[in-house]
From Swiss-Prot:
The gene is Rps6ka6. Forms a complex with MAPK3/ERK1 but not with MAPK9 or MAPK14 in serum-starved cells. Constitutively active serine/threonine-protein kinase that exhibits growth-factor-independent kinase activity and that may participate in p53/TP53-dependent cell growth arrest signaling and play an inhibitory role during embryogenesis. Its EC number is 2.7.11.1. The keyword Hydrolase does not apply. GO terms for molecular function: ATP binding; magnesium ion binding; protein serine kinase activity; protein serine/threonine kinase activity. The active site is at 218 (proton acceptor), 563 (proton acceptor). Residues 93-350, 446-706 form the Protein kinase domain. Disulfide bonds: none annotated. Residues 351-420 form the AGC-kinase C-terminal domain. This is Ribosomal protein S6 kinase alpha-6.
Amino acid sequence: MLPFAPVEDPWDQEDMEVFGSTSSSEPQVVFTMKNAATVMREHERKEVNDLKMVDEPMEEGEPVSCRREELVKEVPITQHVKEGYEKADPAQFDLLKVLGQGSFGKVFLVRKKTGPDAGQLYAMKVLRKASLKVRDRVRTKMERDILVEVNHPFIVKLHYAFQTEGKLYLILDFLRGGDVFTRLSKEVLFTEEDVKFYLAELALALDHLHRLGIVYRDLKPENILLDEIGHIKLTDFGLSKESVDQEKKAYSFCGTVEYMAPEVVNRRAHSQSADWWSYGVLMFEMLTGTLPFQGKDRNETMNMILKAKLGMPQFLSAEAQSLLRMLFKRNPANRLGSEGVEEVKRHAFFASIDWNKLYKREVQPPFRPASGKPDDTFCFDPEFTAKTPKDSPGLPASANAHQLFKGFSFVATSIAEEYKITPVTSSNVLPIVQINGNAAQFSEAYELKEDIGIGSYSVCKRCIHSASNVEFAVKIIDKNKRDPSEEIEILMRYGQHPNIISLKEVFDDGKYVYLVTDLMKGGELLDRILKKKCFSEQEASNVLYVITKTVECLHSQGVVHRDLKPSNILYMDESAHPDSIKICDFGFAKQLRGENGLLLTPCYTANFVAPEVLTQQGYDAACDIWSLGVLLYTMLAGYTPFSNGPNDTPEEILLRIGNGRFSLSGGIWDNISRGAKDLLSHMLHMDPHQRYTAEQVLKHPWITQREQLPRHQPNSDEPPQEAVAAPYSVLARNPNRHHPILEPVTASRLAQRRNMKKRTSTGL
């Protein structure tokens, strides 16, 4: 048996200044040990306490007795069925969609048809017995046993377990938010606040398992699910080990190799401490977008885990760096968490966490997954959800296999009490969003009418719903020119806000995406400005209040619009009341990403672009405030602050913005209050750090005391139409020069790496 891996920390003496860039050196790997293939061959010949150590699943005919740990797990257990309730069977569930598929079976979205929980949605994990080797069968039964025993707010709940002659069924919580891996693949990396929240909830889940004597052993983003609110739930217990404490340690070689602790790679005895190493790997990946130990193949990855020196990313906070160093201890006895979760909770990285509120799910998650109807699967891989859900007959397994799963059936004891609720039916499902399959379905459901607007990547048309004869608007986006996924997610997540355009349906034919929304019959704010020439101060303040209040809501959720302008702000009806305003066109909107919250991709409409975008210094929510400042200026003056007329070139407009030169004196400005000018000067401040936030704008006296503002329109000698329309006509003639195509996050090298190598360890 090989000795323990070296106990020194895996960090370089000199930290890396920039981590993960092409110019930085790769983590230094020291290959002074036997290669991993030799290690594995040696261990295949070794026995520890008479337990044969094999990495591959055993064949059907191999004696089960060679694995004592598996033999123990074949002891039949008492059937868990509440008195008076019948056992579940496949006929009691309607198959709705395929959520995932592996070599052993599928995961379906299902709806219960009978019983006290009729109408409830579940995830149904179906495994074919004939496809499972002996070790996999043991793992499946182990997963069922653990889920029966575990009851925790951050661990997926098992509601039913049953079997047929050829298949095994686990009926679990359906988590609409998908998994953390999917979110990480889309966003590449998370902010430290996001990571802190996920790690804190995960720490409580791991502690609960450890207190029950369970080592999880397969911690990775794919096994952490998000509910519709954004809280986590740990799932997939096929590799977990029951009844393991400091005196009774596990020896199995299992898990996803990139997340394995050194003692697991070395096939030495391991306990709960191994989970805290994997916890550190997960933290590192979420913060940096890359794995700390990943070679060109499995063997090199194992070598790196045992020997590699790794640079500490310097953009991480001191607290985050400290936690990583304490988790990445190659000696498990020295690893943070080896003495229990309390030492993890006491670490400075979690200083802002209220653990009691967290356990009660009273802490607001930093990210709310896109979700519409209860059975919406937008957060799941369309490769699976597009398939027709079909539970094919399973081949009968051997008699020995049936004996192995004796006592597999289970019904949650709280099933009647838990589901004294209104069943989910078509009448009470919120008709917000439905992801539909193709354009044929759109043409069957809607009749296209005239154009409403034409953009660089899309066209907006009026349409009529054939069944109800109700008018809607549809935005048709060319997927070859723009990735609409982020716009769809943001609209799905925040479309319930009264001042954000609501998304009704989404159709995708592969080339075009069709976004069906409300038809805004009141027209654009731009049209109203042109019609009135300028607003009274009271009307301008009322309009700015509604828009800024909506923007504040978006900013609090880490969303920036990045294209706020009068043509993207519409009235719901012809009353033109400020409360009927809705912000539309989220084509340039983004969720803030990165530890510093900055965005580096410039996209803008001239006149409404902040100066720091032009210099590509990165920008955050302050750019939206700049755009709102330009909007306020335009409402009060009837023209934009940086355009002199229709003959202005884009270069001239952008140069004036870069210089930050605008006038608040002379002409119409002699009739504008000092309060309005003061607010404008703060909203159009050149320095984004000194520019007002949305919250500060809302607290300004010109907003809070708007009922006292003048209601009359000031006289204006300016020709407003040409001045206001100039930037838009210029951009219409030169769309590509000032609206660069933004490549989706999936085009990044990190996202491509994830797409090429989808890590799996248990098949499902």
